[in-house]
UniProtKB/Swiss-Prot annotation:
<keyword id="KW-0238">DNA-binding</keyword>
<comment type="subunit">
    <text>The nucleosome is a histone octamer containing two molecules each of H2A, H2B, H3 and H4 assembled in one H3-H4 heterotetramer and two H2A-H2B heterodimers. The octamer wraps approximately 147 bp of DNA.</text>
</comment>
<keyword id="KW-0544">Nucleosome core</keyword>
<dbReference type="GO" id="GO:0005634">
    <property type="term" value="C:nucleus"/>
</dbReference>
<feature type="compositionally biased region" description="Basic residues">
    <location>
        <begin position="1"/>
        <end position="17"/>
    </location>
</feature>
<protein>
    <recommendedName>
        <fullName>Histone H3-8</fullName>
    </recommendedName>
</protein>
<keyword id="KW-0539">Nucleus</keyword>
<comment type="function">
    <text>Core component of nucleosome. Nucleosomes wrap and compact DNA into chromatin, limiting DNA accessibility to the cellular machineries which require DNA as a template. Histones thereby play a central role in transcription regulation, DNA repair, DNA replication and chromosomal stability. DNA accessibility is regulated via a complex set of post-translational modifications of histones, also called histone code, and nucleosome remodeling.</text>
</comment>
<dbReference type="GO" id="GO:0000786">
    <property type="term" value="C:nucleosome"/>
</dbReference>
<keyword id="KW-0158">Chromosome</keyword>
<dbReference type="InterPro" id="IPR007125">
    <property type="entry name" value="Histone_H2A/H2B/H3"/>
</dbReference>
<dbReference type="GO" id="GO:0046982">
    <property type="term" value="F:protein heterodimerization activity"/>
</dbReference>
<dbReference type="InterPro" id="IPR009072">
    <property type="entry name" value="Histone-fold"/>
</dbReference>
<feature type="region of interest" description="Disordered">
    <location>
        <begin position="1"/>
        <end position="31"/>
    </location>
</feature>
<dbReference type="Pfam" id="PF00125">
    <property type="entry name" value="Histone"/>
</dbReference>
<dbReference type="GO" id="GO:0030527">
    <property type="term" value="F:structural constituent of chromatin"/>
</dbReference>
<dbReference type="GO" id="GO:0003677">
    <property type="term" value="F:DNA binding"/>
</dbReference>
Length: 113
């Protein structure tokens, strides 16, 4: 007995695994941002912008639909619809700001309807 240990089988298996080519060799995974990164980037983008975020024609249809409940065949100046849209978006932005403050106060991140 020389005292030398017999080679272990799992070492041979490990070496064989290293030399074998992986199934997806040469295929690079597409780049993905971590969860929340894109959301934060969008928040910064929309906070900087001053343009209207709701499309004009769908908003105009909504205004006409609501107005038709009170009186049919009403006509609107384009500036009147624009003023309504500015007011509606300003109200919604304020509402979301307050909602976010409430979520932070409640130690929450997500807001839900």
């Amino acid at each position: 007995n020389t005292g030398a240990k017999a080679p272990r089988k799992h070492l041979a298996n490990k070496a064989a695994r290293k030399t074998a080519a992986p199934a997806n060799a040469g295929i690079k995974k597409p780049h993905r941002y971590r969860p929340g990164t894109v959301a934060l980037r969008e928040i910064r983008k929309y906070q900087k912008s001053t343009d209207l975020l709701i499309r004009k024609l769908p908003f105009q249809r909504l205004v006409r639909e609501i107005a038709s409940e009170y009186k049919n065949d009403l006509r609107f100046q384009s500036s009147a619809v624009l003023a309504l849209q500015e007011a509606a978006e300003a109200y919604m932005i304020g509402l979301f700001e307050d909602t976010n403050l409430c979520a932070i106060h409640g130690k929450r991140v997500t807001i839900m309807p």
